[in-house]
């Protein structure tokens, strides 16, 4: 028996749809299981799906996600409220295709040797200093690439390349490409200090290591979660071994989503 969970944005419209979806799926004989679902239906927007991703990040190999957007077009959500009955029937009766997207692994290590902190990001990780300019060495594949001075760094996944990364002038990458992207935030470039000044696309197995020059407190944002880290030795970023799995019941082309989100359908 398939087990499901429904995650809601928490507003009246989303909560009403959540209740309706739960009732319909239970009527079809599916089991509601908030702890170990086979499929998670996210009702809201992209933020709701990010929340669901982090809630179930420990079982990404066993759980698939599908999104229903109740506001503006959701980049991860391909169903609208008027299609709820159709979606429920598809979940209950139709074998679905699994589409996997890469995610970002972030490991924070500390100078005192205490246990490292590991995170997964669906969209991006941003790294800033709360004490002014961020000054860090950036290593790629174990070799020093540059010393960065500026407001911060953004490391994004392909599916997250349309978010903060795009605002920084980064490229939009198709999620079939297993890579991460490193983009700079307001880097300092003059005759003394130089950075590459362009976004970098790092393929799978290319690790980016960010090592602070001075003793600062880092503000590390993992998607919507903002965390402070002190006494940091390094922050390691790479394509994670895990993937997020989406349940697809119909085509949902990536470039069509990009077009709808940023260009529109035109006249």
From Swiss-Prot:
One of its GO terms (cellular component) is cytoplasm. The active site is at 46 (proton acceptor). Its EC number is 2.7.1.23. Its cofactor is a divalent metal cation. It is found in: Cytoplasm. Keywords: ATP-binding, Cytoplasm, Kinase, NAD, NADP, Nucleotide-binding, Transferase. It comes from the Bacteria. The keyword Endoplasmic reticulum does not apply. InterPro entries: ATP-NAD_kinase_N, ATP-NAD_kinase_PpnK-typ_C, NAD/diacylglycerol_kinase_sf, NADK. NCBIfam families: PRK04885.1. Involved in the regulation of the intracellular balance of NAD and NADP, and is a key enzyme in the biosynthesis of NADP. Catalyzes specifically the phosphorylation on 2'-hydroxyl of the adenosine moiety of NAD to yield NADP. This is NAD kinase 1.
């Amino acid at each position: 028996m398939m087990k499901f969970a429904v995650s809601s944005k928490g507003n009246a419209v989303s909560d009403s749809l959540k209740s309706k979806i739960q009732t319909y799926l239970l009527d079809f004989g599916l089991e509601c299981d908030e702890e170990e679902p086979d499929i998670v239906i996210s009702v809201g927007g992209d933020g709701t799906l990010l929340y669901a991703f982090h809630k179930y990040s420990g079982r990404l190999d066993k759980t698939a996600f599908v999104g229903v957007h109740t506001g503006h077009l959701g980049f991860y959500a391909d169903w609208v409220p008027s299609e709820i009955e159709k979606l429920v029937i598809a979940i209950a009766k139709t074998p679905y295709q699994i589409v996997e997207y890469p995610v970002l692994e972030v490991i924070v290590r500390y100078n005192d040797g205490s246990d490292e902190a590991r995170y997964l990001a669906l969209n991006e990780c941003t790294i800033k200093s709360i004490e002014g300019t961020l000054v860090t060495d950036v290593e790629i594949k174990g070799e020093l690439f540059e010393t960065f001075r500026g407001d911060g760094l953004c490391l994004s996944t392909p599916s997250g390349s349309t978010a903060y990364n795009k605002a920084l002038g980064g490229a939009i990458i198709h999620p079939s490409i297993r890579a991460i992207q490193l983009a700079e935030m307001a880097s300092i470039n003059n005759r003394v200090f130089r950075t590459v000044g362009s976004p970098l696309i790092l393929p799978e197995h290319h690790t980016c290591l960010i090592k602070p020059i001075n003793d600062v407190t880092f503000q590390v944002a993992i998607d919507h979660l903002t965390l402070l880290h002190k006494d940091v030795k390094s922050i390691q970023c790479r394509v994670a071994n895990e993937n997020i799995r989406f349940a697809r019941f119909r085509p949902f082309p990536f470039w069509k989503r990009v077009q709808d989100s940023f260009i529109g359908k035109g006249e």
